[in-house]
């Protein structure tokens, strides 16, 4: 059995992930549900060989030393995959996340005009947040693609690993992969400020240093896109501020209130008739919102988003209601994801 055959099968089924796990048959995740492929269980040696074949020496060394490693892998004509190889109680395991080879446009994803407005801001910080596998990378790729088609800018991305590959259209695009082209997010961000970028994408704002540098880049006139694993705008503000020591919190609130342009928190929901659709909470950095951030009144943010509909803001529940009204998702699925389920 060949890994490229398994990955081609997985992509053909529209799977978001392929799971290999010693002692079990291969499995795929389709529309959010994990399903078994009708094949015999794989032994440890088989899984080990399948993943070793596609690793380079550095990745093999990492895997042996740290018992896990991340890398990306491309099957030409099929798709690119983000791979995590690990060890588990029955032996080796690996997960291949499908990255479609084509960047979907905002129109194809059904993203509203507000996403263009958010992308068009000249400088500041735009955060796209949500749990793992909620489509953050897809949303960001569409926003970068829109800019790549409409502006004459330098786009610099720092990713671990590179997911969507952007060709330079109107923009110059440089994509840097952590551990391959740079030692880490903070190192790459530090030198980014000397690389004349207009737009910087930070794949993950994991630690204090990366968040600090991203805020500085946004303050110094760059448009910075970043991702966090938070599930709402309010939690995102708290998360960023909480990373800093007590004596810096007031300063960070002030920096955020100046530079934050938007927080888009998203989740994926099963569509009626198959497939999934993204639902978004959208917060825009209006003077009222900036004030709430500065004065640490994050609890009042939800009602500010509710009343900011004319400015393009929406709560997750407002978005879910719209998707139910369009007949895209069922009431039951909306209720599962809603902040206030009784509204459904």
Located regions from the model:
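Short, flexible helix-loop junctions that flank or precede catalytic/ligand sites
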Residues: 1-344
